[in-house]
């Protein structure tokens, strides 16, 4: 084994933060130093040349001064017997670089901690430095040799029920954490007595996972009686009623991994499977929709919990039908009170929590990062979501109890697209190969399905921790590329059947696959790819290692499937074959036995149906009179409540422009304020139709009136999605996610009554279907605190997500108040019809109260009329701005509109209030409704339309936006409230800022927060030195000659399709080229005029961002020759964007004229930054930027490592004067800047892109390929038609070729 020291592992900011954490744990800690340690398992001595290559490979990341370590060593390594995702990718890179003597590379972090501490304190330090699920801590570098030793497989064990009877199975139930019910234990004893043998542990685990509440939804399928009265339908039956009443537009419901609804027809853009040339195929592009929860893992380990939650939901979409493509994501969090240190709010009363789960604040720091990191690396934009906190002591008939979300809600959802012919699963023929696609088995996430079905606190902490999975998004990306290549083959798609691997691992996925295909299966356990050879059969079969799919591929299609996997470098294995008889057999060639041999009907068959006999409880509540409150104090409290406050800290960490199909993200207007009501994507690059999604949830209302909380969640979803242009209300389909503390007094009846209100009443009345959903029935946390039994129980929680096809994505409304449209009015549409019910409102919560009467949807006809009128007014161009009324009420809706429009407000409440005592309730009630901005000359017509629809009593003019910074509210001329927009916006932004400050580089957070005080910030602007609507490539396109451009990608790259679309539009033939094509000699770069290296996360950024990709080109002789030859050709051009920019900057030794280029390293904020930034095009030789010098315009940014690092100040100066700086970040006034967030990565002198001395090679961190259409821009000037300003860049390249 070779030991190679690496670079320091912590930036200055991360170092001081970790040192502070360690000092809090162990006060004797006085110093800390951390560096990477690399270990190489070699089968022979390396030559000096090979050693040099290895040394260069392992030099990556930013240049940080190296120290001589002192202090006690805590060496954090991957657990022995495992292979980390880092290791598998780094080892791949080494092999691609010709280092065949290296069998494996592995990496650890050597922490050197100074101070005098005891062994107990040393253990506390070790606990803080590692994740015991996947890592261990050593005190000696040499001990790392055990990384490369192989453990012996553990054998099978049987449970002796023939001899030991029921007691033996009850013992196994506890030890293995199976969560079997009494009747299931009886069922298993009967079944195995019938088979005449003892069950193996693997069979029991498999049964427990397949029949867990998590997988079987027993409560939703149960029979019920309430208060002694038998109920006619099950919960699931009532949800399905919505489909039975209105099934039009639904292509698949309740039977697959996601549901499918009818989409628009467009030119679906992808590479031809034979020629690899990108092109558009005109066809229906149907919409798939799915929303999942990952609550249990997120409570225990928020980053991996939320990451694998997102990953699992993405796999559900990809595994729909015969293979589909995920498109856009959403995320949601509900937690208990945050109690931010130094920012604890008056309503946040400390109650404590069990040891086994983390705090609400930790969940909101780590969880969103996990979810965002997975989506970012996979390459899916995160476009909408919600965030709520709730934790309150309430009085019930049984005494006081705390209701809240110690077991959080972590919601991961999204939509995708699927071809019409692939919506339904195919046939599994006898003899079909049963394949696992994706990563290897590892001992992680064991028993997750059963664990998440228990109330937190009823299983052991070790079992809880073992049930959390770990993520590897780059592997999932590779799997998705395989699935994409398969569905792109159309009727030659080799996939006949596909499922994702989730709860229960292969033990759930393979039986489900063959059972759904009406087959049995025969499997060989040792064919499962396995990175932990010491696992027992149960562990191999049931672990929940992520990023895996199971597929059935016909024998005749297998070679085609295999070739696709090899090109994409995606691991797969044939584990079994389909049989005619419905028997499940798993053989084990290592031990020569059969760990599983049972009829599928025993596993999945007649397990007893649950019956629930429950009683209703009287409703609870307390008195709350808002009229006695000080309005200024109320405003301040409400604006700081997390459900109301800015969600910026959740949004800028997630890529919102990847795919180039995003038409509406959360950030609105020239000042990019996070207030959008819905998310909208384009169907494809050639149309203006699309898809919308929006969310609704009002969970605290369930404590007062559970059915009202369900109806309000649906109502809010509709008032949110109404901002997009949708043909008719029934086009909207809903996902319903139900969370409940089943068994808690009154909760089961509340659940039943709410499902009935939604499924049997409101949805049928609206003509809306719920074709998909998910339930989580164990929303309670119990623990003992110094002998006192404590518990926190969540309210019944229905989270609704709406999806719909969109008629015209250019007509999506936003809350941005327009000050350039003359005199305008603000009109309130109050669907509560003046009732102003305050129950469970944010205002009540910020005073520790609930109130008594919840807002509700009293009449479905009002909601239908509202939707129709808004759609009509939008279609006719009458609405300038739109925002729904929700958390915080009318006051918050109008303030958010003013924040987005950077203007003041003059509100007068004369038309909506009768007396002063009503004013607080009018400003803060959360009844359904919306505020719209219309031109004053159109106000009579707009009011008349509402009147004609029966909503005359719901509408009133409440004021006007004004062109200054003042917010004033009056009643009959008397002032009610006044404030400055800037200061109110700071209050609204402060909760987000406080979390950002704890999580990211505090200096950056401070700069962004202070920028809100700037008075004359003009926002994003456009100043062009060319005509955006002038197509300079048109004459060349007319000739019919289309030069070829190689759209280059490596494993983990995810931005190739939109890049190809931009070049295709400019008149090129874009060809899909994988690095594996170049390494294998399948592709010759001499066939291409241009090459573009695309964005993403090549090798998951292992060995540095873009560095692994570059080094596999530098140190592979065939690839090096190919690239060098291409760069030296005077008729060739090259573009590198984001990850491609990082990659090309590391290839500078092959690129003539690139000697001034920097190295790109971690952003100054230490965070992934997804924003719209202003850049100025510099005077340079770049062939892409000719005629654009001096132009200033917005561009999409999405990167974690974009900081341009030069060797020293002289090198920076040389670059500056060499004329090779192509782009610089500027502030909204047009000045070159290093200030955050205008300069999102902190690059010196605002450097955002470089070119070569002759201009043929250009690299940049921003993403022009994501904003080449006008509609792709989060904000754009109104005079832009089809093209965005950045389209000019691609047309310049086409003109240059001629």
UniProtKB/Swiss-Prot annotation:
Residues 303-327 are annotated as: Disordered. It catalyses: N(2)-formyl-N(1)-(5-phospho-beta-D-ribosyl)glycinamide + L-glutamine + ATP + H2O = 2-formamido-N(1)-(5-O-phospho-beta-D-ribosyl)acetamidine + L-glutamate + ADP + phosphate + H(+). It is found in: Cytoplasm. It comes from the Bacteria. Transmembrane segments: none annotated. Its main location: cytoplasm. GO terms for biological process: 'de novo' IMP biosynthetic process. GO terms for molecular function: ATP binding; metal ion binding; phosphoribosylformylglycinamidine synthase activity. Keywords: ATP-binding, Cytoplasm, Glutamine amidotransferase, Ligase, Magnesium, Metal-binding, Nucleotide-binding, Purine biosynthesis. One of its GO terms (cellular component) is cytoplasm. ATP binds at residues 305-316, 384-386, 676, 886. The keyword ATP-binding applies. Residues 1045-1298 form the Glutamine amidotransferase type-1 domain. Monomer. Phosphoribosylformylglycinamidine synthase involved in the purines biosynthetic pathway. Catalyzes the ATP-dependent conversion of formylglycinamide ribonucleotide (FGAR) and glutamine to yield formylglycinamidine ribonucleotide (FGAM) and glutamate. In the N-terminal section; belongs to the FGAMS family. This is Phosphoribosylformylglycinamidine synthase. It comes from Pseudomonas syringae pv. syringae (strain B728a).
């Amino acid at each position: 084994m070779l030991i190679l020291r690496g670079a320091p592992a912590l930036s200055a900011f991360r170092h001081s933060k970790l040192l502070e954490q360690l000092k809090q744990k162990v006060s004797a800690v006085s110093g800390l130093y951390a560096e990477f340690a690399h270990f190489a398992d070699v089968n022979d001595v390396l030559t000096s040349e090979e050693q040099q290559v290895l040394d260069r490979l392992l030099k990556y990341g930013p240049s940080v001064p190296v120290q001589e370590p002192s202090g006690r060593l805590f060496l954090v390594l991957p657990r022995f017997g495992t292979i980390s995702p880092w290791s598998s990718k780094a080892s791949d890179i080494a092999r691609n670089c010709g280092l065949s003597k290296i069998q494996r590379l592995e990496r650890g972090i050597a922490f050197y901690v100074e101070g005098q501490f005891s062994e107990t304190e040393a253990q506390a330090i070790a606990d803080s430095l590692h994740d015991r699920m996947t890592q261990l801590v050593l005190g000696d570098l040499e001990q790392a040799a055990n990384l490369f030793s192989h453990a012996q497989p553990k054998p099978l064990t049987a449970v002796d029920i023939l001899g030991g009877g029921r007691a033996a199975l009850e013992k196994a139930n506890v030890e293995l954490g199976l969560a079997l019910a009494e009747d299931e234990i009886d069922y298993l004893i009967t079944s195995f007595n019938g088979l005449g043998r003892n069950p193996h542990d693997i069979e029991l685990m498999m049964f427990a996972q397949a029949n867990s509440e998590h997988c079987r939804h027993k409560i939703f399928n149960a029979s019920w009686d309430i208060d002694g009265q038998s109920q006619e339908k099950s919960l699931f039956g009532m949800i399905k009623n919505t489909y039975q009443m209105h099934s039009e537009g639904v292509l698949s419901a309740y039977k697959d991994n996601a549901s499918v609804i009818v989409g628009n027809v467009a030119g679906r853009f992808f590479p031809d499977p034979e020629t690899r040339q990108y092109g558009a195929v005109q066809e229906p592009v149907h919409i798939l929709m799915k929303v999942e929860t990952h609550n249990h893992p997120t409570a225990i380990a928020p980053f991996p919990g939320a990451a694998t939650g997102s990953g699992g939901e993405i796999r559900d979409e990809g595994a729909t039908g015969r293979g589909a493509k995920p498109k856009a994501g959403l995320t949601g969090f509900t937690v208990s009170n945050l109690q931010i240190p130094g920012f604890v709010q008056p309503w946040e009363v400390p109650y404590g929590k069990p040891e086994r789960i983390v705090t609400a604040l930790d969940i909101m720091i780590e969880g969103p990062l996990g979810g965002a990191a997975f989506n970012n690396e996979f390459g899916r934009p995160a476009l909408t979501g919600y965030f709520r906190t709730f934790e309150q002591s309430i009085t019930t008939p049984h005494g006081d109890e705390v209701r809240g979300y110690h077991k959080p809600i972590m919601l991961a959802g999204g939509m995708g697209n699927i071809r019409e012919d692939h919506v339904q699963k195919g046939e599994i023929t006898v003899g079909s190969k049963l394949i696992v696609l994706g990563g290897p088995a590892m001992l992680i996430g064991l028993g997750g399905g059963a664990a998440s079905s228990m109330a937190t606190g009823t299983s052991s902490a070790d079992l809880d921790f073992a049930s959390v999975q770990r993520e590897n998004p780059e592997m999932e990306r590779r799997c998705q590329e395989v699935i994409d290549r398969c569905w792109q083959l159309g009727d030659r798609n080799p996939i006949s059947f596909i499922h994702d691997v989730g709860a229960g691992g292969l033990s759930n996925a393979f039986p489900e696959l063959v059972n759904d295909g009406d087959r049995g299966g025969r499997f060989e356990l040792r064919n499962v790819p396995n990175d932990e050879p010491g696992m027992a059969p149960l562990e191999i079969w049931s672990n929940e290692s992520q990023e895996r799919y199971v597929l059935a591929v016909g024998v005749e299609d297998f070679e085609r499937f295999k070739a696709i996997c090899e090109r994409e470098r995606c691991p797969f294995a044939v584990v079994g074959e389909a049989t005619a008889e419905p028997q499940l057999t798993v053989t084990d060639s290592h031990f020569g036995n059969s760990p599983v041999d049972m009829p599928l009907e025993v596993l999945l068959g007649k397990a007893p149906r649950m019956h629930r006999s429950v009683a209703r409880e009287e409703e609870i509540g307390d008195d709350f009179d808002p009229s006695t409150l000080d309005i200024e104090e109320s405003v301040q409290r409400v604006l700081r409540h997390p459900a109301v406050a800015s969600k910026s800290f959740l949004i800028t960490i997630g890529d919102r422009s990847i795919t180039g199909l995003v038409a509406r993200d959360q950030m609105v207007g020239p000042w990019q304020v996070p207030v959008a009501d819905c998310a909208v994507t384009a169907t494809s690059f050639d149309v203006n139709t699309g898809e919308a999604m929006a969310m609704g949830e009002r969970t605290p209302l369930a404590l007062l009136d559970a059915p009202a909380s369900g109806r309000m969640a649906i109502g809010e979803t509709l008032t949110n999605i109404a901002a997009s242009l949708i043909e008719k209300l029934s086009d909207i389909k809903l996902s319903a996610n139900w969370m409940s503390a089943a068994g808690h007094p009154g909760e089961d009846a509340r659940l039943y009554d709410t499902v009935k209100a939604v499924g049997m009443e409101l949805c049928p009345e609206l003509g809306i279907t719920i074709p998909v959903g998910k339930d989580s029935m164990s929303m309670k946390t119990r623990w003992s605190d110094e002998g006192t039994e404590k518990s926190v129980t969540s309210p019944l929680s229905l989270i609704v997500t709406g999806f719909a096809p969109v008629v015209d994505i250019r007509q999506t409304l936003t809350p941005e108040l327009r000050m350039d449209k003359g005199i305008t009015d603000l009109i309130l549409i109050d669907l509560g019809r003046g009732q102003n019910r305050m129950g469970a409102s944010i205002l009540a919560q910020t005073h520790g109260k609930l109130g008594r009467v919840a807002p509700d949807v009293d009449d479905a006809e009002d909601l239908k009329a509202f939707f129709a009128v808004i759609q009509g007014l939008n279609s006719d161009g009458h609405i300038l701005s739109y925002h729904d009324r929700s958390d915080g009420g009318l006051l918050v809706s109008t303030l958010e509109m003013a924040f987005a429009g950077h203007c003041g407000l003059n509100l007068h409440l004369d038309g909506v209030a009768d007396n002063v005592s009503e004013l607080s309730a009018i400003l803060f009630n959360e009844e359904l409704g919306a505020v719209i901005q219309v031109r004053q000359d159109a106000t009579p017509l707009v009011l008349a339309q509402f009147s004609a629809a029966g909503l005359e009593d719901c509408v009133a003019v409440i004021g006007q936006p004004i062109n200054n910074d003042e917010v004033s509210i009056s009643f009959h001329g008397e002032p009610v409230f006044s404030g400055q927009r800037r200061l109110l916006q700071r209050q609204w932004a402060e909760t987000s800022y406080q979390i950002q400050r704890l999580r990211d580089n505090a200096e950056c957070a401070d700069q962004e927060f202070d920028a809100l005080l700037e008075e004359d910030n003009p926002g994003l602007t456009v100043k062009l030195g060319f005509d955006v609507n002038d197509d300079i490539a048109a004459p060349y396109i007319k000739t019919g000659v289309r030069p070829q451009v190689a759209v280059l990608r490596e494993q983990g790259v995810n931005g190739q399709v939109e890049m190809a679309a931009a070049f295709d539009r400019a008149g090129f033939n874009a060809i899909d080229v994988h690095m594996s094509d170049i390494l294998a000699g399948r592709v010759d770069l001499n066939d291409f005029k241009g090459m573009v290296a695309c964005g993403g996360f090549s090798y998951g950024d292992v060995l540095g961002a873009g560095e692994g990709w570059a080094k596999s080109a530098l140190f592979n002789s065939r690839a090096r020759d190919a690239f060098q030859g291409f760069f030296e050709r005077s008729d060739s051009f090259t573009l590198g964007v984001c990850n491609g920019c990082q990659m090309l900057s590391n290839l500078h030794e092959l690129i003539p004229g690139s000697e001034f280029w920097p190295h790109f390293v971690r952003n100054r904020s230490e965070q992934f930054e997804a924003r719209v930034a202003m850049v100025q095009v510099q005077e340079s030789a770049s062939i892409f930027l000719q005629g654009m010098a001096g132009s200033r315009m917005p561009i999409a940014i999405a990167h974690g490592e974009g900081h341009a690092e030069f060797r020293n100040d002289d090198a920076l100066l040389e670059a500056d004067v060499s004329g090779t700086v192509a782009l610089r970040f500027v502030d909204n006034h047009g000045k070159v800047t290093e200030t955050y967030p205008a300069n999102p990565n902190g690059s010196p002198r605002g450097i955002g892109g470089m070119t070569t001395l002759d201009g043929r090679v250009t690299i940049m961190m921003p993403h022009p390929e994501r904003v080449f259409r006008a509609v792709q821009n989060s904000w754009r000037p109104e005079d832009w038609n089809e093209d965005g300003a950045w389209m000019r860049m691609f047309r310049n390249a086409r003109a240059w070729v001629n």
